[in-house]
Amino acid sequence: MVKIRLRRAGRKKMPVYQIVAADARAPRDGKFLEVIGRYQPTAKPHSITIDKERVEYWLGVGAQPTTTAQSLLRATGLLYEMNLKRKGRSEEEIVSEMAQWQERQSARLQKRLAVKARRRQAKKDAQAAAAASAE
């Protein structure tokens, strides 16, 4: 069985993962069939590059993505786009749906960043209040 999974590369404490199509019996960093993307978790923000045509090919011939690889494919919107194609939507509908999806994702990211900033500020204020009351 062919799996779409991550293959670790990079150096110590600075991982870079290649998204590969590999035989399920092969070791994690061992023999693989094809490199179909790259994931850099240490970049800010993390970056995912994927060759969409090759991923569609491998999924089309029955390759199964691992849980982590599937979440990365979902984060890029590739699985959503393939689902729209499978439902028989026209190319214009797919393009408009993907644009809406992209807007929702960017809004979600902005919301997360705002929550993170609020929490950071609240923590800073609490520490300042604790320092002031300690004096």
Curated annotation (Swiss-Prot):
Any Pfam family the entry gives: Ribosomal_S16
Any one cellular-component term (Gene Ontology): small ribosomal subunit
One annotated GO biological process: translation
InterPro entries membership: Ribosomal_bS16 (IPR000307), Ribosomal_bS16_dom_sf (IPR023803)
GO MF annotation list: structural constituent of ribosome
Keyword list, A-Z: Ribonucleoprotein, Ribosomal protein
The protein's name: Small ribosomal subunit protein bS16
Gene: rpsP
Source superkingdom: Bacteria
Keyword 4Fe-4S in record: no
Family classification: Belongs to the bacterial ribosomal protein bS16 family.
